[in-house]
Design a protein with these regions (language model features):
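Conserved small/polar residues in nucleotide/adenosyl-binding loops
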Residues: 101-103
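N-terminal glycine/serine-rich phosphate-binding loop of ATP-dependent small-molecule kinases
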Residues: 1-97
Length: 103
């Protein structure tokens, strides 16, 4: 059975998952863009639900690909939007507003 690593890159314009061999060779990439909102000049916002949806989609894509290659994913690494802020409602678990990217 082949063994793989996965990197999830949740960036400011898209979510991407990359399937790597153990030697670090990229085997397969899935990428999905999401909507950018510009409420004011110089501001950028994202919908947290859309971010989560795109991450789930690209991760599912690489999992399916690894199974087609008769492989097993050993580990997952994650990178994200360092500067992004999301406020969550403690009781509902839902976001209060769109995520704030650049102000």
């Amino acid at each position: 059975m082949k063994k793989f690593l996965v990197a999830i890159d949740q960036g400011t314009t898209s979510s991407r998952a990359i399937l790597f061999s153990l030697s670090g060779k990229p085997i397969y990439t899935s990428q999905k863009e999401f909507t950018q909102y510009f409420p004011k000049d110089g501001w950028v916002e994202h919908n947290p639900n859309e971010i989560w949806s795109t991450v789930r989609k690209v991760l599912t894509d690489v999992i399916v690909k690894s199974k087609k290659l008769k492989g097993k994913i050993l580990t997952i690494g994650i990178t994200n939007q360092r500067e992004t802020t999301i406020l969550w409602d403690k009781k509902s678990g839902k976001h209060v507003y769109l995520s704030l990217i650049h102000i």
